Amino acid sequence: MPDMLTLWTDIKALFEENNSKTAYATWIETAKPIALDGNKLTLELPSPLHRDYWTHQHLDQQLVEYAYQAAHEDIQPVLILENERQQQATLKAKTAPVAAGEPVEPTPTFMKETALNSRYTFDTFVIGKGNQMAHAAALVVSEEPGVMYNPLFFYGGVGLGKTHLMHAIGNKMLEDRPDTKVKYVTSEAFTNDFINAIQTRTQEQFRQEYRNVDLLLVDDIQFFANKEGTQEEFFHTFNALYDDGKQIVLTSDRLPNEIPKLQDRLVSRFAWGLSVDITPPDLETRIAILRNKADADQIDIPDDTLSYIAGQIDSNVRELEGALARVQAYSQLMHQPIATDLAAEALKSLNLANASDAVTIPVIQDRVAKYFDVSLKDLKGKKRKKAIVMPRQIAMYLSRELTEASLPRIGNEFGGKDHTTVIHAYDKITESLKTDPQLQKDIDSLKDDLRR
């Protein structure tokens, strides 16, 4: 096992890669490693607010997964505040060691019950244009599991509400039918459980744990990529549940057919139900999300300040809520009421001013249209002239390369075209770049222009 600082550095790198800049700067970078005792990593957090966030947003569970990726060790986090250090030391001193020679029965980690986040409900979910279809489908599944949309597959960028809806389904089913057996797990946790079952020779218990449920929720299944053994096991788990009429809900950052090295038979089964795209919230929805969060956390904040924060961040809900929490923490530290000026000061170090300059599909369309001297109407239209088709394909290629938009969303921005059209355009440009130096020059010029 690596030493504490090396382990924490590796874990932080994975946190930074998989979380927004705001969330990382506010919640992860402020954590301080204190001790690595066996498989327990003690982290000191600066405030109770931070510890609540780590728990409610499942950062502790993410840490377990990232530690396994970094060191192939089952590391469990212990979250303490600075004034609890002495209490932690006392507790450690009172812990009696296991008697020498006494056999310890290995307990597979998958036997531990996975709890849903009680705060993730349909009541606390803010509906907007980008998620209303996903919300409607989730509600249907929670009321009639295993009937209409099975599996239900949510896909979209980080922090847009996929996990919230997944938990909301589980919470609603448990509210309506308390005897419902619900299992929520991330794909990495599923993989770790599977590996643990092999190592402890408890494969049968593993299968009972995952197949004897009424609702299986699996988050971030894109991490099944390149894991042949895990995919094989999940294939049989999926079949067992589906054949028994049990509901399956999955999330990913992309469509199943876009996940590299995902078995065709899994791609096919994931398509049996309904796949729903969740897109970033518009301004009105972002303001509503912030107001909802402020009311839930009893934060006294003016409407104009909420509008200011919503105007600064347009990427995802997680980053929005992270910004609000940062403003709240800054207000408490400065002993000042929250106002727009204070919010601007609190968010200044995040360089959010650059967020408005981020590359978007409309910006790409505008630059490509001007570069090739075609109209936006033609670029997004159906004309098949070569002088228009090539710029259109280049714009689709750049949209795929420079934004996090899904294939259906890109197609929608180009006059409602099917996602297969986007795939064809991307593949066409990718192939042409290998033999066409002028095309390479055009692409490079456009990329330079878009990144300035």
Swiss-Prot record:
Region called Domain III, AAA+ region, residue ranges: 115-331
Name of the gene this protein is made from: dnaA
Protein's name in the database: Chromosomal replication initiator protein DnaA
Cellular component terms per the entry's GO annotation: cytoplasm; plasma membrane
Subunit and interaction comment: Oligomerizes as a right-handed, spiral filament on DNA at oriC.
Protein source organism: Levilactobacillus brevis (strain ATCC 367 / BCRC 12310 / CIP 105137 / JCM 1170 / LMG 11437 / NCIMB 947 / NCTC 947)
Pfam family, one: Bac_DnaA
Keyword set, alphabetical order: ATP-binding, Cytoplasm, DNA replication, DNA-binding, Lipid-binding, Nucleotide-binding
Domain I, interacts with DnaA modulators, as annotated region: 1-72
